[in-house]
Regions:
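Amphipathic alpha-helical interaction segments
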Residues: 1-193
């Protein structure tokens, strides 16, 4: 699927800056490239029109990687695979894909009707449910993004990232923003929007 290979290509281009952002061991960019190359391969090998199968395979492959980011993506992909059982990826399901992938297995998404706000609030709940700290953190992130000129969708993505496991460290927040932006841009351009 072109969607994930485009993310992998973008991560290759940004590998050095992601490594520099990783204050712990300076290898986050390397791991992110590896993670998305594995996801790309697994999704390509999946039966045609079976995104869930590809995501589940990628999740299993990532469990073998000795990386905190791989562990988080593995959990998120497993959750995404469950969500996408019998469902295709389209403009209406991009937010749940981003939420589950970047949620580290803790995103709360449900199938069915609901807008962006429902998706955002659902993703903030995590395993322990939504609390005031989650709302304030997401709201502050949303407001900051809007002040920086981001669209509502970009600001919502920033809010999701800031309140997720991926937002707990600067290097993971940086790579998550890249991943989410590329997923959105690629899907929008593929749909002609």
């Amino acid at each position: 699927m072109k969607l994930f290979s485009t993310v992998a290509e973008t991560l290759v281009e940004n590998q050095t800056s992601l490594n520099k952002a990783d204050e712990y061991n300076q290898d986050h960019g390397y791991h992110m490239v590896d993670i998305f190359q594995m996801i790309t391969g697994a999704v390509k090998e999946a039966p045609k029109n079976d995104l869930a199968s590809g995501l589940a395979t990628a999740s299993k492959l990532l469990t073998e990687k000795p990386s905190g980011s791989a562990e988080m993506y593995s959990k998120g992909l497993a959750q995404a695979a469950e969500y996408f059982q019998g469902q295709d990826l389209d403009i209406n399901s991009i937010m749940p894909l981003i939420q589950t992938m970047l949620g580290g297995g803790e995103a709360t998404v449900s199938k069915g009707a609901g807008g962006l706000l429902d998706s955002l609030v659902g993703s903030l709940g995590g395993e322990d449910g939504l609390d005031l700290g989650d709302i304030l953190s997401a709201g502050a992130s949303f407001m900051q993004s809007k002040q920086e000129g981001d669209s509502n969708l970009e600001a919502a993505i920033d809010a999701v990232i800031s309140s997720s496991k991926m937002g707990e460290t600067p290097h993971r927040a940086q790579s998550s923003k890249l991943v989410a932006d590329v997923l959105l841009q690629t899907l929008m351009s593929n749909l002609g929007q």
